[in-house]
Each structure stands twice: as C-alpha cells, then as structure tokens.
Amino acid sequence: MSPSETLSRLLRERQAELRLPSVSAAVTAAGKVVWEEAVGIADAETGVAPTPNTQYRVGSITKTFTAAAVMALRDEGKLGLDDLLSAHVREAEGSPLTLGRMLAHNSGIQREVPGDVWVKLEFPQTPDELVARLAEAEQVLEPGTHWHYSNLAFAALGEVVSRVSGGAAQEFVEERFLRPLGLARTSWLREEPAARGYYVDPFSDVLHAEAEVEHSGAAAPAGELWSTPADLCRWADFLAGREAMHAVQVMVDAEHWTLAWGLGLMLHRRSERVLFGHDGAMPGFIASFAYDRTERRGAAVVANASTPALGVTAIALDLVEAALEVYPAEPELWRPAAQPPAELEGVLGRWWSEGMEFTFRWRGRLEAVPEGPARITEPAVFEQEAPDRYRTVAGRERGELLFLHRDNAGAVAELRWATYRFTRKPEVVSAS
C-alpha cells in the first residue's frame, strides 16, 4: 500500500471501531503536512460529509495556545513563572497560586469554575464574573503536591494574559500565533464549513445532537477554539521549537511512566519514544494531537462525538508511528564546513576528565561528545561569551561554563568545564 493508503486504512478502521460520526486527521513530516483525510458525516441533518477543511471544536487544545501566550510574555520579561497570580490579578490577593503551577496543573485549585457550568452550560461571560467565581473556588490540594487538572486555572491564566498584554487574551493569541503562522482555519467562534456535535447512543447506532456552546466567555482560554487537523499539525511544528514548554513538571514514576505534563503540554511515552501533545473535548467534539520532536513527525485528529478523548489520542499516536514507517526521514547529506574559529586551535580532539573520554568537535558550533557507554547522550553544545569562555546551551551540563586554559606560549593546555579539569591524557585526580 502507498503511504496515504496505509494512513487512510488506519483512520477508517478507528472510525468504525470507535463509532465516530466523522473523523478528520492530518500528518506532518519535517514541517510539512503530507497527508490529510476526513471520513463520515459532518452534519447528520443535511448528510454533508466532512472535508479536511471542515472545522471541529478542539476543546482543551486551546490551553496550548494560552500556555504559549504566557510563555511569550515570560520571554518578554513581563511576567515570571514563579509570580503569584495576585501579582497580575490583584483580586486574587492571598491566593497561593503561581503561574508555573497553574500551567502544569499542580496548583491544587479546584477543577472547574464554581457553579453549574457543565449542567447549564453557562460560563462566566466577563472578567469581573470570572474573578468573582475564582474567589469562591476551593483550594482542594496543597500547591505543588499533586497533579490535578484545572480548567479554572487556565481561565485565570487567560485573564493574566489579558491584563499583562493590555488586550483580550483571544486577541493576543490571534496576533502572536494564528495570523503569523497562517492558521487561517483556527478561530474562537465557528466558521463554516464546520461539523455539528453529536452523542452516539451506547446501545444503538442513533445520533443525538448535542447542545451547542457558542461562546464560553471569560473561560474561553481554557477550551474555546475551533480548528482543523492541518492547522493543529502546523501548530505542533511551531511548539516543537519552544523548549521551555517541554520541561516536565510532575513525574510520579520515572521508570514506567506513560503520561506526564510539561507547561501546558501533555507528554506521552510509547516504548522509548516520547511525544508531546494535548487532547480536548467539548459537548459533541473530541480532538487530539501528538508530535515526536526528535523525528519531526506529528498527527492531529478531530471528531464530532461525545466520547472520551483517549480514543482520538490513540489514533493520533498510531498515526505518528505509522508516519515514521511510511514517511522515513531523508538522510542528511554531509557537506564541508568553514574553518573553525582560530581560538579553537588546540581545542578540537580528545580530552579526558575523571577517567571519562570526550571528543570536542566543530560542527558549525563547538560540541562535546562523550565516548564509550555515555555516547548515547546528545552532544553538549557551546556558545562563546568571551575570549576563552563558553556557555553550555544544550546537552550535558547545560548552563555550565567552559573555560580554555592556556600555557605561557598561548596554547590551550587544559579545559575547565563545570569546574572539572580536562586534560589531553588520562590523569589521576590530584589535590595539587
């Protein structure tokens, strides 16, 4: 079978297995959407079939946009992850919540906005109403002690974005992400063509139309967006480069874990492969995306059914694995590089520290690769800060300094990396 036939078969099998009225999916490889397909019924009343351009509500995937907005303001120095919520929403004075814990779902605040929001589908429509509901919320767990998912926390983070940026959080997301990235089919309100949401009777194949939530008001940053799989794939490609959002905040079982959290992102483990993403659900809709940063392969899946989002998350993960098979990475050709900087003369080659051998090399940048059993780790990467002074910016000992020590003739005699001494030959550690 061709790559598209393989992916199409997988999608159609899962649609039948999960009894989804319709399902739409896309796959991205090396920054390009390489496959997309939609099957089923987008609108049961009219019998209209979906296309890859059909919008679906993506629910909590919206949180990844809100998290990216918070991180963008952090990068600009306008807020910090250790800031208390009250530093930006003064009405929250006395609250123990910090922005970082809210992003990672370990703030301990209750899950939902106080009230009957999921019974009456009535959400706080104004910032004042949201802040008033926040004051009624219960601190159900001690901050930082347990993972506890909270839509309320992300609604409050949206208010932080609004106050810090000086405009609505929705406008900030549009200006910073949707328009620059060309996510033309991602919007806060439904834009036709769009699917209708359904509940599938568990004991028959009858569809029931779900109540529509047109606008969730001040809670929108927690789950309002509509989108398409192709747009979500482009979004995942963008997020893959935002290193700070991938820092794991909670890890209960380091050996056997299969699901963890970064800052606004879910982390999935399948065998030795780690993928990031997020899922989402609103009445009548489920959605998920998953992305392998190492291989630059990702997938997004949306459907119009009220059923656990785990089903479409499994489809997305399966599509990524299938994409790795049918769209293998192209081998990167070797090309000669420019001469290394003169300062690095005498640095490149093999060095030893405490019985461990490292190769320092130039690959358009200074790198250090451990030899022997430790070679499986990523190379350390250095950037020059001053003459004979480098900062480790990636890999082993990230953040630590590397100094070049020279002899009286000006030749590099030894290195000091993270205060450890490196010599050209193995030497016994000495206090002299």
Specify the residue positions occupied by each region the protein language model found.
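Short, conserved catalytic-motif segment at the N-terminal edge
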Residues: 2-58, 78-83, 87, 135-137
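Short loop/turn microsegments at loop-to-beta-strand junctions
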Residues: 21-23, 56, 168, 286-287, ...
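Short, glycine/proline-biased beta-turn/loop segments that scaffold the active-site neighborhood
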Residues: 81-94, 181
